[in-house]
A protein has these predicted regions:
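Conserved acetyl-CoA-binding loop-helix of GNAT-fold acetyltransferases
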Residues: 75-88, 114
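Conserved catalytic-core motifs of GNAT/GCN5-like acyltransferases
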Residues: 99-101, 113, 118-139
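Short hydrophobic/aromatic beta-strand or adjacent loop that forms the aromatic wall/cage
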Residues: 37, 142-147
Length: 152
């Protein structure tokens, strides 16, 4: 039986920080970009299972800072449904582009490219210079950040 997913916009102060920390291990950085952000959540049976946080860069450009799904709900299409909803919503609001930054390896590279995101630039040593603790993914330390952009 397919789960009924409701996707809606909510206030940043209602977003569960634990869920945001699934995608970004720095509570300080999360709190920085959360203030004044645009937040969407995926809800199943009244439980928030996914979140997407964006912030205005300038008039028609927005940055996706965080997209996360609870571990027990991952690989079930929730993240894809959430991102598609957000992108459709941004198009309706006449945004021109969405930007994001992520590590240089991992499943998220394929995930974003399936939606049409293209690599725009590389920020060398970003994760080394901007996080107090090293971040490891699949046993490999994240060092550089890939910047992606999607023209809407």
């Amino acid at each position: 039986m397919e789960k009924m997913i409701e996707i809606k916009e909510i206030s940043p102060d209602l977003v569960p920080q634990k869920l945001l920390l699934e995608a970004d291990p720095s509570i300080e950085r999360v709190n920085q970009y959360l203030e004044g952000s645009l937040c969407y959540v995926a809800v199943i049976r009244k439980e928030i299972v996914g979140v997407c946080v964006l912030k205005l860069i300038e008039k028609n450009r927005i940055e996706l800072f965080n997209i996360a799904v609870l571990p027990e709900n991952q690989k079930s299409g929730i993240g894809s449904q959430l991102l598609q909803f957000v992108l459709d919503n941004l198009r309706e609001k006449n945004f021109e582009s969405v930007e994001l930054g992520t590590g240089t390896f991992g499943y998220q590279l394929t995930f974003y490219q399936r939606f049409g995101f293209r690599v725009d630039s590389i920020l060398k040593d970003y994760f080394i210079n901007n996080y107090d603790e090293p971040i490891f993914e699949n046993g490999i330390q994240l060092k550089d950040m890939l910047r992606f952009i999607l023209k809407l």
